[in-house]
Amino acid sequence: MADSRDEPLVLGIETSCDETGVGIVRGTTLLADAIASSVDEHARFGGVVPEVASRAHLEAMVPTIQRALKEAGVSAKDLDGIAVTAGPGLAGALLVGVSAAKAYAYALGKPLYGVNHLASHICVDQLEHGPLPEPTMALLVSGGHSSLLLSTDITSDVRPMGATIDDAAGEAFDKIARVLNLGFPGGPVIDRYAREGDPKAIAFPRGLTGPRDPAYDFSFSGLKTAVARWIEAKRAAGEEVPVRDVSASFQEAVVDVLTRKAVRACKDEGVDHLMIGGGVAANSRLRALAQERCEAAGIRLRVPRPKLCTDNGAMVAALGAEMVARGRAASDWDLSADSSLPVTDPHVPGRAHTHAHTHGHDHVHEVSKENLYS
């Protein structure tokens, strides 16, 4: 077995939405996962406000990097690379992270790796369950994405199988939570109420499940509208809305479609491993139904612990470490944020394949043990 010190030591920065995440990994071992969330600042607006998120990232970036280095017990000088989410995500939020990573990598004389947010959500599973089997089918569900992806090489070959044609699953959870006056974010609170409700109480529609519908695409807009109208009709009639039953029935409609299509994709492609990631993967019913259906189909299910399902820097560091380990080219210094970066680009390599440490200057200045560059 190789010495763990030979495994890449990588720091990852995540700012695609409202979490400022900084993670540090050595190979597939998680050393630090520091997060500063601005979710409370967005709650009063009922959703993420891009400008608020960007400003929060600016304020949290340096303290979060410092916290991660301290938690990991490593020196910045010993890092083998800096990875950062280059997209997709909110443009302004991404720009804060990319700018910070570029400055930090250049100052340290370390290679920079701009990586894909969705590919990072897949790769984070390695920190919990070891190397990803190749190929692996991945179901990624969050407030911004609902995608089925086939990964044969997480650093270079990720193929989209299906995606939502309208709203993401997480967005639907947030919307229904608002209609039920349960607050933001909606996923955790719906999950909580649903545990005490009857998932068969109300027959809500399952989008794109007909014989002529796309096999792997999702649609949650119709479901969202149907649930909202059902609630409004109850209120208009002066009747009490059964919040727990509505939550359970709505949640069941979402996870039924997600798991059904994911298992079908595995069967059709002959893939015996399914990984589920993204914020909605923390949902207890999604995990339970996926396990049940995967066992019945002879498919191995891999789901990271809930904290690693939501946005974090550890997942970015994990993918960055994989890039280093496989000898992938570092990004150029003109790396920019791309809010619509396709998942077919797991990372953004440099045109000339130049690494940070070849620029010929020593920019490492140790000021104190708390200094970012020490």
From Swiss-Prot:
Its cofactor is Fe(2+). Keywords: Acyltransferase, Cytoplasm, Iron, Metal-binding, Transferase, tRNA processing. It comes from Streptomyces avermitilis (strain ATCC 31267 / DSM 46492 / JCM 5070 / NBRC 14893 / NCIMB 12804 / NRRL 8165 / MA-4680). It comes from the Bacteria. Residues 347-374 are annotated as: Disordered. It catalyses: L-threonylcarbamoyladenylate + adenosine(37) in tRNA = N(6)-L-threonylcarbamoyladenosine(37) in tRNA + AMP + H(+). The gene is tsaD. Substrate binds at residues 140-144, 174, 187, 191, 283. Fe cation binds at residues 117, 121, 311. It is found in: Cytoplasm. NCBIfam families: gcp_kae1, T6A_TsaD_YgjD. Its EC number is 2.3.1.234. Pfam families: TsaD. Binds 1 Fe(2+) ion per subunit. Belongs to the KAE1 / TsaD family. GO terms for molecular function: iron ion binding; N(6)-L-threonylcarbamoyladenine synthase activity. It is an enzyme of class 2 (transferase). This is tRNA N6-adenosine threonylcarbamoyltransferase. PROSITE patterns: GLYCOPROTEASE. Required for the formation of a threonylcarbamoyl group on adenosine at position 37 (t(6)A37) in tRNAs that read codons beginning with adenine. Is involved in the transfer of the threonylcarbamoyl moiety of threonylcarbamoyl-AMP (TC-AMP) to the N6 group of A37, together with TsaE and TsaB. TsaD likely plays a direct catalytic role in this reaction. PANTHER family: TRNA N6-ADENOSINE THREONYLCARBAMOYLTRANSFERASE, TRNA N6-ADENOSINE THREONYLCARBAMOYLTRANSFERASE, MITOCHONDRIAL. One of its GO terms (biological process) is tRNA threonylcarbamoyladenosine modification. Residues 359-374 have a biased composition (Basic and acidic residues). SUPFAM superfamilies: Actin-like ATPase domain. GO terms for cellular component: cytoplasm. InterPro entries: ATPase_NBD (IPR043129), Gcp-like_dom (IPR000905), KAE1/TsaD (IPR017861), Peptidase_M22_CS (IPR017860), TsaD (IPR022450). The lineage of its organism: Bacteria, Bacillati, Actinomycetota, Actinomycetes, Kitasatosporales.
